[in-house]
């Protein structure tokens, strides 16, 4: 239950430490996160903060949503995202407030959620790293097939979740415990160490890490 930011994946680059070490980073644009609603236990049954990100033409906004945003005094956004937070943290915010990258600090571990790049219809070798069949020696048509999926008479069916060919990618993926390497407060950018899910321009959600790793050897 932590407040986070909605961002846009700009791309990857690298930065250098004072010692000259190269660090690969993903640049996330987290500008203009604005509060559209504060939900409370009394009115909604739970405590949360609703945030708008990006922009959207007025002609693309439904009348109910337009009224909702007008009540908060906030322009329409491309995305509405809700973050569950504690009641005391919600009390510090108000409709129309802008949440910036100063929500995080350099060195902090975060979880980044996005939608992975779609790969289309893929076979089991590409999708699940299956091994291929023999190139010859009696194999004429089954080089890349996954093999039998059948079961015995009992249970007499294929279990759900069987790894087979199908649509690869385009799934919600969360990468945990990424480190914030640098923050550009002027341009409202987060530079996160490592790669995050999705293509350039994709939307991501950045929240404080839930399962922070313990330092090896620490007491």
Curated annotation (Swiss-Prot):
It comes from the Bacteria. InterPro entries: Ribosomal_uL3, Ribosomal_uL3_bac/org-type, Ribosomal_uL3_CS, Transl_B-barrel_sf. Methylated by PrmB. One of its GO terms (cellular component) is cytosolic large ribosomal subunit. Part of the 50S ribosomal subunit. Forms a cluster with proteins L14 and L19. HAMAP family: Ribosomal_uL3_B (MF_01325_B). PANTHER family: 50S RIBOSOMAL PROTEIN L3, LARGE RIBOSOMAL SUBUNIT PROTEIN UL3C. Belongs to the universal ribosomal protein uL3 family. This is Large ribosomal subunit protein uL3. It comes from Burkholderia mallei (strain ATCC 23344). The gene is rplC.
């Amino acid at each position: 239950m932590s407040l986070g930011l909605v961002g846009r994946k700009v791309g990857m680059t690298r930065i250098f430490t004072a010692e000259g070490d190269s660090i690969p980073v993903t640049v996330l644009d987290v500008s203009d996160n604005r509060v559209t609603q504060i939900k409370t236990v009394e009115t909604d049954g739970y405590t949360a903060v609703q945030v708008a990100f990006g922009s959207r033409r007025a002609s693309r906004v439904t009348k109910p949503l337009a009224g909702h945003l007008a009540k908060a005094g906030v322009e329409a956004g491309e995305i509405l995202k809700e973050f569950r937070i504690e009641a005391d943290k919600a009390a510090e915010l108000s409709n129309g407030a802008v949440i910036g990258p100063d929500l995080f600090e350099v060195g902090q571990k975060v979880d980044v959620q996005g939608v992975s790049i779609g790969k289309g219809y893929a076979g089991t070798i590409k999708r699940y790293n299956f091994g291929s069949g023999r190139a010859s020696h009696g194999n004429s048509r089954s080089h890349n097939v996954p093999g039998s999926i059948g079961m015995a008479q009992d249970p007499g069916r294929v279990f759900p979740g069987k790894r087979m060919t199908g649509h690869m990618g385009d799934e919600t993926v969360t990468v945990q415990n990424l480190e914030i390497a640098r923050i550009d407060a002027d341009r409202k950018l987060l530079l996160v160490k490592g790669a995050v899910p999705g293509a350039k321009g994709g939307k991501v959600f950045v929240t404080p890490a839930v399962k922070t790793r313990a330092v090896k050897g620490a007491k």
